[in-house]
Each structure stands twice: as structure tokens, then as C-alpha cells.
């Protein structure tokens, strides 16, 4: 019997212990969850925080401050192209992470590998200008880094969402808060750097080095923190393979028969008997002595099952988990999350903050306000009063997601100056940012807690599916944004 002091106890939904009531190992896992959230979006935020650098990247790549571009359409829309390449790559790659061959890869390898790829993206952006290349080479570099970032993000994001989806909901909420805090950090730094450094060729170059250096530094610290996580007893109660030992995770209703034959789906009656054989199939991770005792005392000692069997590894549970069955369980939270980010990326940042192109500070301050209230919304599920009162009231989150469509006319009218004034834009960013963080975070937290998600394999897959929902909504929203911006330019 496991007597480790950090053995997990069930927690009420949305409820987390005060930091001073936690063990050191539990608090450390919260810190790692937060750092994973920050690192997840840090590369994208670093690129978007230095738009002047990326939009004139050809000058730095050609090492010529007076260079005139030939591919004007690409450089005028370079941020959109970069974002679209990354999102489409993630949308293609992230579902592949659910395939059985990928799920056999140890969790720690996926986390560290995805993080290394994200670091490589930023290193490439910094190395190419140092070595020098042509404008075509600069275009290829932007496209390649968009692909590299999308590839690394899909691996790191799907694994992180899945892993922390198997922990109590407060860990997912903390990770989501880290995602929002990444935007706050880069926005705050952008304001400071923009005020301190000139917008000259050398000034913009220094700005990019600050943003990219911060990104690599934070992701490097996250890399080290994840390595140390394998020695954390609290984390091993959820994913033992992080420490290269047998997992103590909850196998739920996953049977030994299902684990050995993942392509077969035996049915069981209410008493846990296999309907085809009539035999009881004990759950993995439970004491397996009843069947042996029925054969006599000698059979207990000779049984191939030990008196108390260690649970399967996390990867064994994942391989035995049905994807589409899990998707049916989380479908409404999947839809709510996808539509939430569809609306957000349709309007933000292009439409929501681009209505005053001649203003030096409007877009910078508007993005900062959005990020601050977005992170407040992402942390709000840590307050129990922000949760639906019962399981049946989860429809409120779906309704809130679809209600955000009201921002489309409100922000479009402002972008066309039918509603004048910068103050209106700032107020809208407060509501828009908080609603994005709250709805997105609640959907991501509630998804792995849906009925029928009864073991950690399903919770991991549910968390991964919720991460995919962000990409689905984000891709559609980005495409709609490009179409809208194109129509605006022509008319």
C-alpha cells in the first residue's frame, strides 16, 4: 500500500488548497504548471512584441538598413503569414499526437522535445541575421520558423494540456494563467522598451534581442524545472513515468484485458464481469487477490498476479484509451472552447487594436489591457464562486462562449470609426480580454471532468482534445480575420 505523504486525495472541483497548506512537492508542481503555460506562448509573444523587427526582417537578414523589399505583400502581412503557418502546422500536428504510436513516447520526452523545438525557433530567427542572407532567404526563414514553432508548440501544448488535465482542476487553471501571464510580461516589457529605445535600425535590433533573450531564458528555466519534476513525489502520484518508475495513476475502469488487447472492447456488467466470459475483471492498480483466493491458498502464492499490483505506466493507459469515445464525452466543452478562441482570433489583434494606425501608443496599451484582463479571467476558475453551481449548469459556459459573438459588431463598428474615441476601445478590451480568459479557462478545466472520463488516460486525452479545440477555433478565426482585412483593403 502506498503510504507516501504526497499521495493525492480527491479535491472538490475548482477548489485548491492555500499555498501554505501544500507540501513542497505539490507547490513545486504548481510552479511548473505556471512555467509551462508561460513557455507555451512565449515564442509567439516574443515575435509579436517586436513587430517592427519582423516586418523589416529582410533588412536585418540582408544586413542593409536601406534595403527595399521586392516581396512587398509578404512583408506587409508578415505577422499574419507567420501566425497562420504556425496555427495550421499545429492544427495538422496536434491530432497526430493522439495516434497510438505517438502516445507510446514517454511523456517527459514529449515535453522536453517540444520545448527544445520552441527554443530552436527563436535561435534560428537570431542566427540568420548574424550570418546574413538574401531577401528570399529572409522570407524562407520566417516561413520555416513559423513551421518550427507550430510543430514544437503542438507537441509541447498537447502534452502539457493532457498531463495537467489528469491533475486536479486547479493545476490546469494555473497553467492557463501562465499562458495569459506570458502576454502580460511581453506587453509590459514592450511598453518599457518602446519608451527607452528609439525606433531606429539599431534600436529595433536591440529590442528584438531583449524579447528573444527573455523567451529563451524562460524556456530554458522551464526545461530544467521539467527535468527536476521527475524526482517529485507528488507528480509521480499522477504520472509515474516522469520518474521512470511504474505509475500510481488512477486506471479507473481500464481493465487488464483492455490493456493487453487495446483493439478489443469487452463489455462488462454492473458488477464488473466480462459479459462474454462471465469472469470478473479487476481494475488495474487495485489489489488482485480475490480470483487467486477462490482457487485455494496455494494459488495465491503461485498466481502470476502479485498480492498488490502496481498500476500501469501512464503510456500504457494512454495507448488503451479510445479517442472518439472521449471526444463524445467532452464535445460541448470542446465546442465552447473552439468558438471562444474563434471569436478572439477573428478580432484580435488586427481588428480589435488596429483602428488607430497613426497612434504611437493605442495598440500597445490596448494589447496590454487585453492581456492583463485575459490573465485575470484565466485565473478566475481558482475561485469556486466562478464555477457553474452543478454539472447540469455547464451549459452556462457554452452560452457564454456563443454570447461573445456580440463583440463582432461592437469592435467592427469601432474599427470603422462609427463609434469614435480611444477610450471606448480600452473599455472593450477589458470586457473582451476577461471573457476570453474566463470562458477558455473554464472550458479547458471542465472538459477533462466530464461524465465518463473516469481514468487518467481519458483525462490526458480529454486535455489534449481541449488543446486541439483552441487550434480549431483559432485557425478558423485567423482565416476569417485575413478575409475581413483583405475586403477592408479593397473597399
Curated annotation (Swiss-Prot):
Its main location: membrane. It is a multi-pass membrane protein. Pfam families: Nucleoside_tran. GO terms for cellular component: plasma membrane. It is found in: Membrane. This is Nucleoside transporter 1.2. The chain crosses the membrane at residues 27-47, 82-102, 109-129, 136-156, 173-193, 209-229, 333-353, 361-381, 395-415, 427-447, 460-480. Residues 261-273 have a biased composition (Basic and acidic residues). It catalyses: adenosine(in) + H(+)(in) = adenosine(out) + H(+)(out); uridine(in) + H(+)(in) = uridine(out) + H(+)(out). Glycans are attached at residue 274. Sodium-independent nucleoside:H(+) symporter; transports adenosine with high affinity and uridine with moderate affinity. Can transport cytidine and thymidine. Residues 261-280, 290-309 are annotated as: Disordered. One of its GO terms (molecular function) is nucleoside transmembrane transporter activity. It comes from the Eukaryota. Keywords: Glycoprotein, Membrane, Transmembrane, Transmembrane helix, Transport. Can transport tubercidin, a toxic adenosine analog. Belongs to the SLC29A/ENT transporter (TC 2.A.57) family.
